[in-house]
UniProtKB/Swiss-Prot annotation:
It comes from Deinococcus radiodurans (strain ATCC 13939 / DSM 20539 / JCM 16871 / CCUG 27074 / LMG 4051 / NBRC 15346 / NCIMB 9279 / VKM B-1422 / R1). Binds 3 Mg(2+) ions per subunit. Belongs to the class-II aminoacyl-tRNA synthetase family. One of its GO terms (cellular component) is cytosol. HAMAP family: Lys_tRNA_synth_class2. GO terms for biological process: lysyl-tRNA aminoacylation. One of its GO terms (molecular function) is lysine-tRNA ligase activity. The lineage of its organism: Bacteria, Thermotogati, Deinococcota, Deinococci, Deinococcales. Mg(2+) 1 binds at E419, E426. This is Lysine--tRNA ligase. Keywords: Aminoacyl-tRNA synthetase, ATP-binding, Cytoplasm, Ligase, Magnesium, Metal-binding, Nucleotide-binding, Protein biosynthesis. It catalyses: tRNA(Lys) + L-lysine + ATP = L-lysyl-tRNA(Lys) + AMP + diphosphate. Homodimer. It is found in: Cytoplasm. InterPro entries: Aa-tRNA-synt_II (IPR004364), aa-tRNA-synth_II (IPR006195), aa-tRNA-synth_II/BPL/LPL (IPR045864), Lys-tRNA-ligase_II (IPR002313), Lys-tRNA-ligase_II_N (IPR044136), Lys-tRNA-synth_II_C (IPR018149), NA-bd_OB-fold (IPR012340), NA-bd_OB_tRNA (IPR004365).
């Protein structure tokens, strides 16, 4: 069909862009559409290879490919991006990359309709091809192209196919280019997708119902973190973006649902580092009539199952070390870990006045940190780096766990809460959920006092949530898992932005605030 009139070229284009546009004009002059509306793609590159497997190297077994073989009765219609192009007089070879793989193409003046216009194909162009497979003299399975169609002209050259994008920040800023040219980039995000699908399937099979809570909230609770603010024009009201999924899921337990979960984005107005991004994905679930022991078993099943799903084994490599997700996971008592690993800590760490003096003397850089947060500071400094394989950190102090139930055996000191750490950072956080409305109000009021004293990360008092608790919330276990950090581990990624398709980045030329190392520690409630 005739091409629609194209807009005039802008002024000031780069000479490479002009050359590519000239090639597009030449293809149009040869009778091709510049921007077709669709293309009848019937297969992917992997389908051709699956139909004609090669022999296993060194064994002579598996496939039957021999140089010169051809299957003219077979027809494949593929589409993808051209990543290599070699013209040889009356023939040309190209590499076509699609979502799942790459295949070599062969064009010939004798057999390929529109052969002359292939000389106007630029690296990065997306084309459609039809043809049959054959084996070259060197034994490479190749598609002999009989028909082809330019689908879109790439106006910019691709980075080197050998090196990809080397600059880490540029990879994140130009993710669309990174996905094109960096080896393994797409596979990371495909693994992340499989990971989330596995979690959903597991929870659905266990009777959990997926729900969606509000992103805009009057009171952003469920964690200790600074929220982002936004103004609603029609209501003339300042709302907050959610920092957790917790409190609305608990309202659903009050309403009668017994097993609920949500996988969604949360937002915390905090710094950025290798394990923190202000916008990140959480799984939170709540299970009526369960406690944190039931949740611990569920966590072991989910995490070990995910390792098997992604790697086919409980053991896999992360940053040069072998991690072992074989259940059961190791366990460490929170206060016991502090006493064992913090040098000079020979007193009860719950004596916050002594802890303040102890830290002021040894860690003067923490003098502005609220006393109760020094517990997590010390744990993060001395204990977390020791937790290589997945480890349950059990029974956190009540002063840092405002939404957890007091421990049934040690109610005066600690709560029924655990976190899972692996390779030095937190993956999961879980509680036996507090459902005593008066106890919860007392803890909220303590947090409100901290907020009045200047702690802008103290948990706000949510009166509607307290009212819901007064109607009666069943005993329950709750869990939060940081999906992005889990994806880091399972894809051997050093930074959280390597597993976020579009991570938050500072404006070019600006500076990012470093993350407080207590930020986002409360990944669930």
């Amino acid at each position: 069909m005739p091409d629609a009139p194209r807009p005039p070229r802008p002024e000031g284009l780069h000479e490479q862009t002009i050359a590519r546009l000239n090639n597009l004009d030449a293809q149009v002059d040869a009778g091709f559409e510049a921007y077709p509306y669709s293309y009848p793609q019937t297969h992917h590159a992997r389908d051709v290879f699956a139909a004609h497997p090669a022999r296993e190297e060194g064994t002579g077994e598996g496939g039957t490919l021999e140089p010169g073989q051809k299957w003219e009765e077979e027809s494949y219609s593929l589409a993808g991006r051209v990543t290599l192009m070699r013209h040889m007089g009356k023939a040309a070879f190209a590499d076509l990359s699609d979502e799942d793989g790459k295949i070599q193409l062969f064009f010939s003046k004798q057999d390929t309709a529109g052969f002359d216009a292939t000389k106007k194909i630029d690296l990065g162009d997306i084309i459609g091809v039809k043809g049959h497979p054959f084996v070259t003299k060197t034994g490479q399975l190749t598609l002999h192209v009989t028909e082809w169609q330019p689908l879109v002209k790439s106006l910019h050259p691709l980075p080197s196919k050998f090196h990809g994008l080397q600059d880490e920040e540029l990879r994140a800023r130009r993710r669309y280019v990174d996905l094109m040219v960096t080896e393994g980039a797409r596979e990371k995000f495909q693994a992340r997708s499989r990971m989330i699908r596995y979690i959903r399937n597991e929870l659905d099979e266990r009777g959990f119902m997926e729900v969606e809570g509000p992103t805009l909230q009057v009171t952003a609770g469920g964690a200790e973190a600074r929220p982002f603010m936004t103004h609603h024009n029609a209501l003339s009201y300042d709302f907050k973006l959610r920092i957790s999924l917790e409190l609305y899921l608990k309202r659903l337990l009050v309403g009668g649902f017994e097993r609920v979960y949500e996988i969604g984005r949360v937002y915390r107005n905090e710094g950025i580092d290798r394990t923190h991004n202000p916008e990140f994905t959480m799984l939170e679930l709540y299970w009526a009539y369960a406690d944190y022991s039931d949740i611990a078993k569920l966590v072991e099943d989910l995490l070990s199952g995910l390792a098997k799903e992604v790697h086919g084994s409980y053991q896999f490599e992360y940053q040069g070390k072998t991690l072992d997700f074989t259940p059961p996971f190791a366990r460490v008592d929170y206060l016991g870990g502090l006493r064992e690993h913090v040098p000079g800590l020979d007193f009860d760490p719950l004596d916050l006045d002594r802890l303040r003096a102890f830290c002021d003397e040894r860690f003067p850089q923490w003098k502005g940190v609220p006393s109760y947060k020094l517990l997590d500071k010390l744990f993060g400094e001395f204990v977390e780096p020791l937790l290589s394989n997945p480890t349950f950190v059990m029974d956190h102090p009540a002063v840092i766990s405002p939404l957890a139930k007091k421990h049934r055996s040690r109610p005066e000191a600690v709560t029924e809460r655990f976190e899972v750490f692996c390779s030095g950072f937190e993956l999961a956080n879980a509680f036996s959920e507090l459902n005593d409305a008066f106890d919860q109000r007392e803890r909220f009021e303590a947090q409100t006092a901290r907020q009045a004293a200047g702690d802008d990360e103290a948990h706000p008092q949510d009166e509607d949530f307290l009212l819901a608790l007064e109607y009666g919330m069943p005993p329950a276990g709750g869990l939060g898992i940081g999906i992005d950090r889990l994806a880091m581990l399972l894809t051997d990624s050093d930074s959280i932005r390597d597993v976020l398709l579009f991570p938050l980045l500072r404006p070019e030329g600006g500076e990012a605030e470093e993350a407080d190392d207590t930020a986002q520690e409360n990944t669930a409630g």
